[in-house]
């Protein structure tokens, strides 16, 4: 015969298992696009890391302008095979390091934990430095070649005027972009 204590324990276990399944499903479905050159786990890692490299402020962040999709397309299209291999292995390594340090995939960690891990990767002596430099390079290229990156983050003028060489930045303000 089942007593009340055993019934409550069973309900708690069932509810815990269901809620765990829902949270892992929600994390797995967080992408709003279908990666073609990356695995879904790698795409989520790129999505989280790119947003840390170029976060949303008064200008759109990397995620909002489609940088993760840009990186996915770059890997599938014009990236050198050695670069693509370095990036894919680096993303897998980043996830493995995140799981070893915090018990969760990189995309599921807190922003502070993600920042701390990427700061370690940015160290000159870190073996992951080449991977992180490539990730930052692709992120900034993708960001500043997007419409929002070129027109909102930078000032856009199709014909910015006459050419004056070395001008103090105070005089002209932010950099200019042409697309």
Predicted features along the sequence, with ranges:
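N-terminal secretory signal peptides and thylakoid transit peptides that target proteins
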Residues: 1-15
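C-terminal segment of classical bacterial N-terminal signal peptides
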Residues: 18-25
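Boundary at the C-terminal end of the N-terminal hydrophobic targeting segment
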Residues: 26-30
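Mature-region segments of soluble proteins
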Residues: 31, 41-48, 52, 66-179
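Extracytoplasmic/periplasmic solute-binding protein
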Residues: 56
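Zn2+-dependent metallopeptidase catalytic domains
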Residues: 60, 64-65
